[in-house]
Amino acid sequence: MEATSVFRPKLGSQFSLPSTTNLFPLRKLYGFPLTSFPGKPIKRIRLKATNTLTFDDKERTRKFKKLPLSEWTHYFHSIPLDISEMDALKEEIDELKPKVKNTFMSSQGSDSTKTKILMIYLFVSLGLAYHFEEEIYETLKEGFENIEKIMAGEEDLYTVSIIFWVFRRYGHYISSDVFQRFKGSNGSFKESLIGDAKGMLSLYEAAHLATTKDYILDEALIFTSSHLETLVATGTCPPHLLARIRNALSICQHWNFEVLVPLDFIPFYEQEKDHDEMLLKFAKLSFKYLKLIYLQDLKILTKWYKKLDFPSKFPPYFKDRCVENYFFVLPVFFEPQLSSARMLLTKGFILLGIQDDTFDRYASISEAESLGNSLKRWAPDHSMDKQPEYLKSVLKVILDTFQEFEKELSPEGRSYSVKYTIEEFQASSKANVELAKWAQVSHVPSFEKYMEVGQMEITACVTVAYILMSMGKTGTKEAFEWLKSRPKLVQSLCTKGRLMNDIAGFEDDMSRGYVVNAVNCYMKQYGVTEKEAFKELRKMVVNTHKTLNEEFLTTTCVSHYVLRETMDFARMIIVTYNGYEGFTRPDEGKIEEYMTSLFVDHTLKML
């Protein structure tokens, strides 16, 4: 096979080396185990390659894709905000909250716990769970102690599926054997279930909480997906339920942002005949208040961002994504009281974007090495004075912003969190330099070697560190040490982030001649087509879903809150790369639609 036929399209020079090359020795640099990924037997391919690596470090006309500035920043910087409206909403919420709580806690009868669990699902879906965290915790703790009694004799598919979903969502390991009751004598799910559209949808949602050993949930996903797709195609159920099924097939509730779910669920619930008017009103008030809090945050954040004046300091190679970055922190910190955490994490994301774009899209090798060395020293290296002004600005904004973090967190006695996060940022920068060297000479390493470096370059570890840094006292030293140990949950996050980014960003990478990508590395190593590579990489992504679920349920060395926010980061990855590159091209997928719904639209009419 000719080397030039392995990659499509042929853009610039294609360069690779056999996997035995010692020019890029495989080192355990980043704490990841050097295990092989599943794939086909290696098939040797002849590649056109030079004998030595050469770097052209002279100033030259750079080839980079100019990225347009975001229109969102100016919009929120100048938008008016009515504080009196926020105060009025808060007053109504405070008046209704105890009434809703009383309805939840006063459930009586033999099925009272079951009724409460079903209501917890409504709380989560309507965006209200944060109002009743203690009550939910106590209810599920008590319920889990009596799970066998609760499930005994329950034959309603919707009820069993929702109870399963709620317990697993909150970290309680309920066995998937509860679904055996819905199988016939032939070992397959009963055909009679097909007529229960809500039950089928709930089983479909429950199947996404599968672990690596929940084979019955694999069967359930196949069974429900095919029949739900038929329902959508034929339109044979109520329109409001049909819309919900269509949304679920696009992205299941478990892997969606918790704050995005109410956008669809509130209108759905309103059209349910048995909906609770008080609960519906409480959901609408809470969601409207939440949106106003976000506007308040964005006014403050965009003011900070505009003062930095990045467009005057950097060439237009970087992704101008202040408001978009704020959107991407919402799966982790969406509750109204967490404004400070959102601000901190958004600023961290902005730094990661500048770092990544500088290494990935613009810097020469000497510039990349100088920036990498400076970040390693956490001060300008000896060559920085000779570098272009833009690079000095990149380094300055990173160092200054971390100094800002230190100033904010030091009074809380949390300087250690900044130190740990800097270490992860430095490790990420080191990986960026390695990838930049490969990219500039179109070197395509083995898949395993690429993943070792690429998993760190994708910034999943430093993102978890940012999350811990932003969490307040819950982000303990022990939590950071857990991160440093590279537990299986974190490894799966890194794999998921790397693969989903590379799958969704493949077209963009190739269009600019950037061949260092998991797809190309897999094609080269295993001698497969692009289509086959995509198929295998997507299988790996699905496996990470199951591993994440499993680790969330079984990890005991850190707090549930840390695990929950880490899982929320996984949700960010999935929504961002759900069939499109949502960060680089937010206008081409659903990201812009989501942002408009959360930050601009006020379509949830009040009762």
UniProtKB/Swiss-Prot annotation:
It comes from the Eukaryota. Signal peptide: none annotated. GO terms for cellular component: cytoplasm. Binds 3 Mg(2+) or Mn(2+) ions per subunit. Keywords: Cytoplasm, Lyase, Magnesium, Manganese, Metal-binding. InterPro entries: Isoprenoid_synthase_dom_sf (IPR008949), Terpene_cyclase-like_1_C (IPR034741), Terpene_cyclase_plant_C1 (IPR044814), Terpene_synth_N (IPR001906), Terpene_synth_N_sf (IPR036965), Terpene_synthase-like (IPR050148), Terpene_synthase_metal-bd (IPR005630), Terpenoid_cyclase/PrenylTrfase (IPR008930). Mg(2+) 2 binds at residues 356, 360. Coiled coil: none annotated. Mg(2+) 3 binds at residues 501, 509. Pathway: Secondary metabolite biosynthesis; terpenoid biosynthesis. It is found in: Cytoplasm. The Asp-Asp-Xaa-Xaa-Asp/Glu (DDXXD/E) motif is important for the catalytic activity, presumably through binding to Mg(2+). Belongs to the terpene synthase family. Tpsa subfamily. Involved in terpene biosynthesis in roots. Possesses diterpene (C20) synthase activity in vitro. Does not seem to be involved in sesquiterpene (C15) biosynthesis. This is Terpenoid synthase 9. The lineage of its organism: Eukaryota, Viridiplantae, Streptophyta, Embryophyta, Tracheophyta. The gene is TPS09.
